[in-house]
Amino acid sequence: MKIQSMFQKDINRDINGVIKVSQDDQQSLKQELSEYIITKELRRHFATFFDNYVKAIDNPTDKIGVWISGFFGSGKSHFLKMLSYLLSNKEVDGKHAFDYFADKFDDPMMYATVQKCVRIPTESILFNIDIEGPINKDKTAVLRVFAKVFYNHCGFYGEDLKVAKLERFIDKQGKT
């Protein structure tokens, strides 16, 4: 018996060593979702996130935010990408993100919490701030990047915030 025959999946398949936000083809997403492993530490982070998220669902607030930090290569982008897929319950290969995670949450309470969260219609906007951001960085650079990406997501011209705001105003007037 060869060691490689002991594995459920082909060990010679392509495995992407670096998770990229922009890599969103169905095959890559399916592999990421199906092969994502929730370690003890990740379980704790998912629990913290979703416990607080469900509190904001039960008691709406504008005082919610998330800060994800860690060393290079520690899995921040991968974790964030999985959160994004779960929150939007993205459909990949005919299966929703939550369904890929159904057997990954071994705690029934956490499973129920995540399930409650994914039932709320949510849009997530994933982007790499280094790619979207301006070369000249000043005090408002991060804010401008967020606004640009948001307006682009809404279908407006986010490259020029004045134009995007005008488009949004016209859209709200129902004149588009």
Model feature map: region roles:
Residues 1-38, 130, 157, 161, ...:
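N-terminal accessory segments
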Residues 31-59, 102-105:
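N-terminal pre-Walker A segment at the start of P-loop NTPase domains
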Residues 66-71, 80-176:
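P-loop NTPase motor core
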